[in-house]
From Swiss-Prot:
Coiled-coil region list: none
Entry GO MF terms: ATP binding; glutamate-cysteine ligase activity
Record protein name field: Putative glutamate--cysteine ligase 2
Keyword flag Disulfide bond: no
Amino acid sequence: MSLEVFHKSAALSLGVELELQLVNTHDYDLAPYAEDMLRLMHKIPLPGSVVPEMTSSMIEISTGVCSSSSEVLGQLSQIRDALVKSADKLNIAVVGGGTHPFQQWHERRIYDKPRFRELSELYGYLSKQFTIFGQHVHVGCPNADSALLTLHRMSRYIPHFIALSASSPYVQGQDTAFDSARLNSVFAFPLSGRAPFALTWDDFKVYFDKMTRTGVVKSMKDFYWDIRPKPEFGTIEIRVFDTPLTVERATALAGFVQSLASWFMNEQPFMPTEDDYLVYTYNRFQACRFGLDAVYVDPATGGHMPLREHILMTMERIARHAGAVGAGASLHLLQTSVERSDNDARWLREKQGEERLLAEVIRQAAQRFRGGVTHTQLP
């Protein structure tokens, strides 16, 4: 299959996808209710879409094309409200977070869809272990070459995205010591990691054609890169975020991406180089392991500094662009959390420290996700 034409999209437009957990309200373990949820949700007129994911205890929601983070919040809130009301009817709950803290991967069921069955046959147990939950942010690019430039500029900020969204400290009932353990599961797949260093669509097409000739890939969907071009949408898709515990934080992360993209497209602040990737995996590991306490190695200078400081410095640098795209509130929310050394991984650990019961932590996380939606479950 040849590479798709890169479609036009409005520069800096946004789209957000969230993979969410479905849990029972007895012991708050994952529950295979995706099909029932989809049946209920498809009766409700909503923006965006609600679709199944790899295993039947997951569901993915997505916005339509949005021009601002406030529009993202409006759409996510509307879908969230419908989700939790549908879940109430089934006596289950919907939860954010990058991993379920104590689910056992071997108990998962692959959702009955041809692509998921094909992936399960190819990847074996990895498919069930892929019951992890991420946020993807699409940002519109005016043309294909701009998309690749933006992708490689954005790669310097992968640690920032990981630390700000980290919400997966627990796996199989254990504290992993990672703020984002979810991304360790992604690395197991052979076509994960980072995109090849190509700054023009012609060069990228050469790479893609070579890969398809090997028979290893058939389409862009086969690449699990941290950031990948999405030619059919005219976007790049950033895929390293853990799903946050609230739609408000998910929106703030999208606003941060949009502000960075505005800075890149309007000021061309630096030219990415292949050498940017010398420290890429190290920076990525630091952010996964230590979150906001990570060390950041500047790809341009080789200098070391606390990631927290680099995040705050970046936010100050892009504040004007955030204001211009209407993402000032998003930046403020994230800035405040960084100053308090506060991310969702910390919240989960603090709750577990108080409760000493991961099921209760999930119950509280479910309450947090639903926001102000009144509970409609029957007694």
